[in-house]
Amino acid sequence: MEELLKRISIEHEKLFPKAEVGSQTEKLEEELTELEQAKGSYDAINELADCFIVCAGIYRFAPQVALLCISGIENTVEELGYKAVFLKCIEAKWEFNKTRKWEFKDGKYHHTGTDQYD
């Protein structure tokens, strides 16, 4: 999983060049809130994938913090028995994010339009 984190981190820097550690930390807090509100395993895996992707952004600035975060995520996914599904979900969500249009406003990136990942 660490190799996937590193690869996404490199791509993250290209997609979100103005991202900063503070904005990525705030984004992780948002994703963790969404995880708490997840309804069922499917939603939880999707939100954990979002958390992983944000951790890839954090990895750019604080690698040890990101690795600690994904360690917790990985343990949770393994306990649920969804590691293979989780890895596919990360890849699919990241590929989807790369197709979106992004806007940088108030120190954060937000996708524009109404496209949604299902």
Q: For each predicted feature, which ranges?
A:
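Flexible "arm" and connector segments at domain edges
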Residues: 1-118
